[in-house]
A protein has these predicted regions:
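Catalytic phosphate/metal-binding cores of nucleic-acid and nucleotide-processing enzymes, i.e., regions
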Residues: 1-154
Length: 154
């Protein structure tokens, strides 16, 4: 793993008051790249000078499996040269009272991967829609999730 990826993981971990996982999540006891008390995050980056980021269906499926036996909410982070895209399940947004509508929804069941190039797009896989948002919007969601989890004793 290169220094750029480590720095991105450390920055995201700091942002959510979490920690970067040992071996970037390849241990049986610590999955994903970043964990906090509230979220479990998988971070995917592009090559250093690319401004195009790809969302792969398998990443969503893997993250969903990894959070199954935890009390954390899944978040997928895609990082290009100039932007970070945070993907959060729409049902999680509804849970914390954030009714977000998407400009469009892309069905991922018929694609293995797709280029992500804008915020406020939904990506549907199975019964879940993952909403793509910017860092500021994600932090609003994260703070509500923290408050919600603390209230419920999670």
């Amino acid at each position: 793993m290169n220094n750029r990826v480590k720095k991105i993981e450390k920055d995201v971990a700091k942002m959510v008051g979490g920690k970067r996982c040992v071996g970037s999540g390849n241990q049986w006891f610590e999955k994903s790249d970043v964990q906090s008390d509230v979220v479990q995050m998988e971070i995917k980056t592009t090559q250093k000078y690319k401004d195009v980021v790809i969302l792969k269906r398998i990443w969503i499926s893997k993250l969903m499996r990894e959070v199954q036996n935890t009390s954390r909410y899944p978040v997928l982070v895609l990082v290009s040269k100039s932007r970070k895209y945070f993907l959060v399940m729409k049902m999680v947004l509804n849970l914390v009272g954030m009714n977000v509508s998407c400009d469009r929804v892309v069905d991922m069941s018929i694609r293995k991967s797709i280029v992500v190039d804008d915020y406020n797009i939904g990506y549907k896989l199975g019964s879940h829609i993952w909403v793509c948002m910017c860092e500021d919007d994600f932090m609003k969601v994260y703070n509500r999730l923290k408050a919600f989890s603390n209230r419920d004793g999670k």
